[in-house]
Amino acid sequence: MEAKAKSITFLADEGSVQIPFFQRGYVWNRVNWDDMLTDLLEFNKSHFLGSLILKQLKAISGEPKSVLVIDGQQRLTTLSILLKALYDLFTEEMRKDTSVELVKYLFYKKYATDRKYYIKITHSRVDANYFKQVIGEVQDGVIQAPDLPSIDKIDDQSNKILQCYRYFYTELQNKDEETRIKLFNHLLNSENKIIVLIDLAEHDNEQAIFDTINSAGIRLSGTDIVKNALFQRAMELLPKEDVISLYEDCWEKTFSLDDDSIVFWGTQKSTGRLMRDHSEILLQTIAVIKGLYDPEKHTLSELPDLYKDKIATYSETELRGLINEIREYATIYRDNIPSFDGSTLYSYEDFVQRLFHILDACDISTFHPYIIFLLKKYKDDEKTLKVRLKELETLVIKRLLAKQETKSYNKLCKDFIDNEAQVKTKADAVSQAQIQAGIKSISNKNATIVLFWIELFRRNKDVKQSVKELKYNYSLEHLLPQKWEEHWASVPVVDDAGNAIADPETAKQVRYSKVYSIGNMTLLNSRLNTSLRNYIFLRKIEGEGRKKGIRQYSELWITKADIIDRYDRGETVWNEASITQRENALCCELLEIWKS
């Protein structure tokens, strides 16, 4: 990698400057054009317009060198259009005088002896024809643009390339000739270093370098790199018309068919410490399934290069196969990966949603490749799919309750794809004793997840229950409060059998330990008033004055049946024995729901 401050005249030393044929289009607008022109017209000030990242392409014997535009497509295109607009505003005599100079920056010849010139910047398929209309061609040593529409025919509905040309042409038309000449010479002054050119060698990893140098944190899309690699290889193997059809039928209809598609695939999700969009997560998922990407060995920045290296070896059949696989997996991904928010309704019967919610609530995305693999494999066998997904759900919940690590999940995901039977084996390895020990002291987050799904399990079993769907917006409450000393000191501390514990220090330790048992936790449809949360059991149940108690917030069975109904039967004391009794009952339910 080499980085140097340069003027736009660096283009004279380049041959073909290629924007990937299937790259997204030119998108700059009037705000961007206005900012650039305003800066450039301040001749007494130095301006930095940004960076260009170019990557050297593999040299072909006898051909001029070619570079690929990795970043900077927008500003490079804009500067070229600005130069052409200035040129078109010159008098005929001045155009003849400056044509030889400008040709060096906008055109190139394949061989020194050729008469034919080619436009230096090869644009994407979206903009190629429009850019050609603006830049034109070299005829008898003079640049001509016979296909360029007249300015009054270009409007706000026209392609952005044409709009950009119209903007510069009309703005500069209102400047005096001296200003236009000065700007033209200023741009083509080799000492006017307005950009930083970052030149990458063929072997350099463009995504890793882009991430490093871009302090604004805007990531180069790994999806774009993979897409370009796929269809550049297709261009090597197939006629151009076939490649365009393949792109439109498989890629475009999948990822950019309409606004909803563009928004979905561009929406970012948190995966560990990184934010990545759905399209990048999909490509990683496919790479894991195919054994191309190993999370234990590879970093995410290596993913595009892993694809590129593999794609470079593909035959036409293999390439078409991969493109079709991506399309098929993308459909499965979009149809099944849910987006959760406060309004989402959950039901126990929706086994795919249930698993994804549990994983999402636990901040686990590692198993997505295995799930997508199963959804594809068993798309016509719902019965087996349900069994396989429940096995994974059981593994996750059992390990969660037993407080087992999650670092090995990357390896497990890969192992499960190779051998589905391992999921049940791993789940069976978590013993009932480990689960019983784990729920004696459980985090608020994990308790909320488990209690919520126990509630939905109960509702699903009861044929009389009409409400089968719930939102995940309940508040966890410790019945014996975390700060119990002030109001609960008069309640005797007892052992599991209900016998009083005489030793004060032992009693204190026992009480503190019981606070965090799942048996001491429930879900309310609203938080208790802060001043009420630490009060004795009776006041917490009934409330005080205008402060509502647990009874008023007991919408869920897990609170009404377990706590309120018990209280109404006369069991008005809540102590360590009560907590143990409920802990054991909940443990039985857990083992019923998530049995392996």
Model-identified regions with their sequence ranges:
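Secondary-structure capping and boundary motifs in well-ordered enzyme cores
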Residues: 68-75, 185-190, 198-205, 278, ...
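A cross-family structural signal marking well-folded subdomains
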Residues: 223-226, 233-457
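Active-site-adjacent bridging/hinge elements
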Residues: 7-14, 45-63, 177-187, 200, ...
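Active-site-adjacent structural elements in folded domains
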Residues: 175-181, 188-193, 349-358, 434-438, ...
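C-terminal substrate/ligand-recognition segments
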Residues: 364, 511-530, 579, 583, ...
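Glycine- and hydrophobic-rich flexible loops that cap the catalytic core of alpha/beta enzyme folds
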Residues: 1-293, 534-535, 539-557, 563-596
